[in-house]
Amino acid sequence: MTEAQKERILGHLKSDTELFTPVGISAVDRTAGYYLPNGYWNGNVWLSHQWFVWKTMLDLGETDFAYKIAETALNAWKREVEYSYYTFEMFSIETGRGGWFHNFGGLSAPINLWSAAYFTPGTYQSGFDTFCESAAFNDTYTAFCGRFTNAGAYDGALLVVMAENGSYSVTLNGASAVFTARFDGMLEITLPKGCKNAEIRIQLV
């Protein structure tokens, strides 16, 4: 994939008039002739396919968009469950409401994975191109050590959720790592492309 191709694809995914909607990424582009507001697969949002897009965003280091995908899905699911107490099959782009089968187990895995990836201490996540050699937290989730290989063509992202105790230091092979604290305890760490069996250490400071 060339850089121009990557940017063009990201542009379509992020566009509020094409694929991205208030309830998540549409199954089809809303500018397509076969998009129907009252359609089934061609007019709604499912969660499962978005998980694959989310993981790919971690491969590309697109952490802001990855979080937007997860946050949008979690909020859409939360609103519907609080209103109806149902876990519907999909969400209508036009109404924001859930629809079709009301106890759809296929919604459960992406929701649980996104919730854990950003809000559950003791959780780590990466993209498809990153291989975890080993990983361990201490009992209080204030320290972490892991070894990771990024086999992708881009600098990827490793998400690690620590305890909400304060600030953390992050090292990559003993040197200061590039990372962002999205919020207290939730760290987004850059894994440089080509790194092999790289040691990540996180410590409460």
What role is predicted for each listed range?
Residues 149-166:
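Surface-exposed beta-strand/loop patches in extracellular or lumenal glycoproteins
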Residues 142-150:
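Short, well-ordered beta-strand segments enriched in hydrophobic/aromatic residues
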Residues 168-170, 196:
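A short tyrosine-centered beta-strand micro-motif
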Residues 171-175:
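Short strand-turn-strand beta-turns centered on an Asx-Gly dipeptide
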Residues 20-46:
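Generic long, charged, amphipathic alpha-helical segments
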Residues 181-205:
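C-terminal beta-strand-rich structural cap/linker in extracellular carbohydrate-active enzymes
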Residues 1-17, 39-141:
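C-terminal capping/lid segments that line or modulate ligand- or cofactor-binding pockets
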Residues 143, 177-178:
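Short, isolated positions in well-ordered beta-strands
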